[in-house]
């Protein structure tokens, strides 16, 4: 087992206190948006004995990853585990499929765009499906609503923008209508002016305050977005998306192509090891609307909220329809004694509550809240004892 120190990501939308509180660190007043526990080159975790996790894996891939993982994914850790703590809405974004990521990366390389250039879309060749597990109440928007539900949200609004959006969806209540409205709202040639967005927000804020909203969550999200990014077209686009509220212990899966934005809360996120993000609004970062639109799945569907499957009294698993990762949560009390932790290496385990001791054939490590370890494939069995909760990312 190797203890890990996460890579800190100080994105402007991050809370200054949520992650430090979990990790037992002082709040230094700067955003701590994400804590990365993985080997991605954009933020590899530090190993307590020295160096970073990616170097450790590069030195002994067969032992730490195992032949099966190398055959399936190459000589790299296929997943990335994070803590994520949005205090302000994230960008309206989508992640590419495997084929789109590989093609986009190659084209940008051919064009000579440096990996660290702010206008680079594709930082790697991998797709980025992801799943977030709420540790506190967690708000998001994810995936397109059914057109009729979007029309209901727009009903009663009299601003020119609301009328245009409503008219298009009524004339074409299909995914093609959704595609037209969404692309019209975010594309540079057709997007509404800041004044039109402000007029729409004024109407929505008024009905929210009056208690006459057809969807309190949608209107609340719009008001939050407008407070942070006034006049941004992404505010109008969010009216087309499903509102999501996760309570602690609930999960949301976001597949490639799903337009989404996290809004507030603290969660554990696991994903394919990638940093590919295509944005269309609600951000000061690089926006490439045509590339983003090319990656979007316009099929309306409810959010994917995986139900936990109980593998034992202590462990529940959240399965995603991808091969790169799965997420497990194990909660133990002292009376349980020593219990097996399902799964296999390579895996990363993060203590999110209490204090627990992990035991392998060759090692024993006690983790306080906020501490994490990497367990290689050579450690075939893992046990836990103590009083606390562990979140584990591994490969199915």
For each of these PLM feature ranges, what is it?
Residues 311-314, 326-343, 361, 368-369:
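Conserved short histidine dyad/triad with adjacent acidic residue
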Residues 82, 90-92, 124, 130, ...:
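His/acidic/aromatic-lined binding-pocket segments of jelly-roll/cupin-type domains
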Residues 265-317:
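C-terminal, non-catalytic macromolecule-binding modules
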Residues 205-273:
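Acidic, glycine-rich loop-and-beta core segments that form the ion-binding/anion-interacting portion
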Residues 1-211, 284-302, 327:
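Transition-metal
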Residues 47-48, 59-67, 231-247, 341-342, ...:
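A short beta-strand-loop-beta hairpin characteristic of the jelly-roll/cupin
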Residues 84-89, 96-99, 126-130, 136-139, ...:
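Ligand-binding loop in jelly-roll beta-barrel domains
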């Amino acid at each position: 087992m190797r203890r890990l120190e996460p890579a800190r990501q100080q994105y402007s939308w991050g809370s200054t206190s949520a992650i430090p509180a979990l990790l037992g660190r002082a709040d230094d007043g700067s955003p701590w948006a994400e804590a990365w526990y993985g080997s991605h080159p954009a933020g590899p975790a530090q190993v307590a004995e020295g160096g970073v996790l990616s170097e450790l894996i590069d030195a002994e891939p067969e032992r730490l990853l195992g032949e099966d993982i190398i055959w399936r994914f190459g000589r790299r850790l296929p997943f990335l585990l994070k803590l994520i703590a949005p205090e302000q809405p994230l960008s309206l974004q989508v992640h590419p499929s495997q084929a789109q990521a590989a093609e986009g990366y190659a084209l940008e390389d051919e064009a000579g765009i440096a990996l660290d250039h702010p206008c680079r879309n594709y930082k790697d060749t991998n797709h980025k499906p992801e799943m977030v597990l709420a540790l506190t109440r967690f708000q998001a928007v994810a995936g397109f609503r059914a057109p009729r539900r979007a029309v209901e949200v727009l009903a009663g609004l009299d601003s020119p923008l609301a009328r245009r959006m409503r008219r298009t969806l009524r004339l074409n209540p299909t995914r093609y209508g959704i595609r037209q409205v969404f692309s019209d709202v975010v594309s540079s040639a057709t997007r509404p002016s800041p004044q039109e967005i402000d007029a729409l927000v004024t109407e929505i804020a008024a009905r929210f305050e009056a208690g006459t909203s057809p969807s309190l969550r949608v209107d609340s999200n719009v008001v939050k977005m407008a407070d942070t990014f006034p006049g941004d077209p992404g505010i109008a686009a969010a009216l087309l998306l499903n509102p999501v509220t996760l309570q602690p212990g609930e999960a949301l899966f976001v597949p490639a192509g799903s337009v989404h934005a996290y809004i507030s809360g603290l969660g554990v996120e696991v994903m394919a090891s990638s940093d590919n993000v295509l944005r269309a609004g609600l951000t000061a970062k690089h926006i490439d609307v045509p590339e983003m639109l090319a990656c979007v799945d316009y099929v309306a569907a409810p959010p994917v909220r995986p139900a936990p499957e109980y593998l034992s009294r202590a462990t529940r698993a959240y399965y995603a329809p991808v091969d790169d990762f799965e997420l497990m949560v194990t909660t133990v009390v002292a009376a349980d004694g020593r219990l097996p932790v399902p799964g296999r290496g390579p895996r990363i385990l993060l203590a999110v509550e209490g204090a627990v001791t992990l035991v392998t054939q060759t090692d024993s490590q006690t983790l306080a809240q906020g501490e994490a370890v990497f367990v290689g494939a050579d450690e075939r069995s893992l046990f836990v004892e103590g009083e606390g909760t562990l979140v584990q990312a591994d490969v199915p």
